[in-house]
Amino acid sequence: MSAEREATEAATVAAAAEARAETGAGEGAPSQPPTVEVASDPQPPPAPEASASASAPPLRCLVLTGFGGYDKVKLQSRPAVPPAPGPGQVTLRVRACGLNFADLMGRQGLYDRLPPLPVTPGMEGAGVVVAVGEGVSDRKAGDRVMVLNRSGMWQEEVTVPSAQTFLMPEAMTFEEAAALLVNYITAYMVLFDFGNLRPGHSVLVHMAAGGVGMAALQLCRTVENVTVFGTASASKHEVLKENGVTHPIDYHTTDYVDEIKKISPKGVDIVMDPLGGSDTAKGYHLLKPMGKVVTYGMANLLTGPKRNLMAMARTWWNQFSVTALQLLQANRAVCGFHLGYLDGEVELVSRVVTHLLALYNQGHIKPRIDSVWPFEKVADAMRQMQEKKNIGKVLLVPGPEKET
């Protein structure tokens, strides 16, 4: 979708929002998910009193109804009512939303930041503002924004704090905006805030073909003479080379520690560790003096569509620990990063987003989209990511599946 077309859509949505507002106040759209499934309730919802809402189609959303496999995320609907955001909030129509490993872990009951079930997942998305609440002066109906939220983005219409929205550059598509925040904030803060990436450094990027991995590769290219080791299956190596990986490593057939030691006997300066378990220890022992391992995930917990108790036990048993004295003697650092626990650090996150948008406008970064799936195909989208078939970001879009 071109930026011009999206701008036209934004104007249309803004006009629609004003028209709805003139019909009178109504109940605000609930932020918690509905409980009526499309497939199981063919009867239309009761018509609201407002005439504009009476003819509006129901709003679609995805809801996690229980912990387990792909079928636990259901497509549901709720009646459309005039948006009524509270003070400091905005309501937007969602055009695209991101799929992240946290969503996969949440489905299995392994993500501690997930609100109680049933809940609409989704930490990020992009769309058009349709209404603003009291006290909001920096957003207006028609603004194209991207959103970073604790959950709830996998739905057609959502109300969020205005402070958690960011204006999109004119040239940015909704798909790019939905692919930017979680992956690029994570990669940026791991590499620069924790890693202090500088010219001449070397970096190990695990899962280099994933969303965070591809973001990290682009960010590494903004610094001169950075050597990048990237792990991924062999079929993805050519793409990794095209995107700045100096030494791709097939983790299926090769011990990445041995491969790195052959090329760089002293190791690397930064290890980006989304794996956890024994891989954190391996990363620590790969560090040069003054090196840093930054752990930001537990992907080793995910070995299938459902929770694997053996994998959980193995990962936790192999969890890495180190004493302060050992760190002192080794001249190394171990850091932890969890974007979900920075949801109250508005200024900190906004600073990073400002840097990222500047890099986007300068042409230094551009989210790579692996695939875009309609809400009906959410199970296929999750499978694509969990089986590590993706190169770049996997996205969801609210619109119904188009007939071919």
Curated annotation (Swiss-Prot):
Outcome following mutation: residue 210 to A: Fails to induce mitochondrial fragmentation
Class of this enzyme: oxidoreductase
GO molecular function ontology, one term from the record: zinc ion binding
Record-level GO BP terms: negative regulation of mitochondrial fusion
Keyword DNA damage tagged: no
Topology in membrane: Peripheral membrane protein
Main location per the UniProt record: cytoplasm
Sequence positions bearing Phosphoserine: 2, 31, 40
Spans annotated as Disordered: 1-55
Residues spanning the signal sequence: none
Gene3D superfamilies listed in its UniProt record: Medium-chain alcohol dehydrogenases, catalytic domain, NAD(P)-binding Rossmann-like Domain
Effect of residue 213 to A: Fails to induce mitochondrial fragmentation. Fail to induce mitochondrial fragmentation
GO cellular component: mitochondrial outer membrane
Keyword Phosphoprotein attached: yes
Subcellular localization: Cytoplasm; Mitochondrion outer membrane
Keyword annotations of the record: Acetylation, Cytoplasm, Membrane, Mitochondrion, Mitochondrion outer membrane, Oxidoreductase, Phosphoprotein
Pfam families (UniProt xref): ADH_N (PF08240), ADH_zinc_N_2 (PF13602)
Lineage top rank: taxon: Eukaryota
Job of this protein: Plays a part in calcium-regulated keratinocyte activation in epidermal repair mechanisms. Has no effect on cell proliferation. Possesses ATPase activity. May negatively regulate mitochondrial fusion.
Assembly and interaction partners: Interacts with MFN1 and MFN2.
Family recorded in the similarity comment: Belongs to the zinc-containing alcohol dehydrogenase family. Quinone oxidoreductase subfamily.
Protein known as: Synaptic vesicle membrane protein VAT-1 homolog
Species: Rattus norvegicus (Rat)
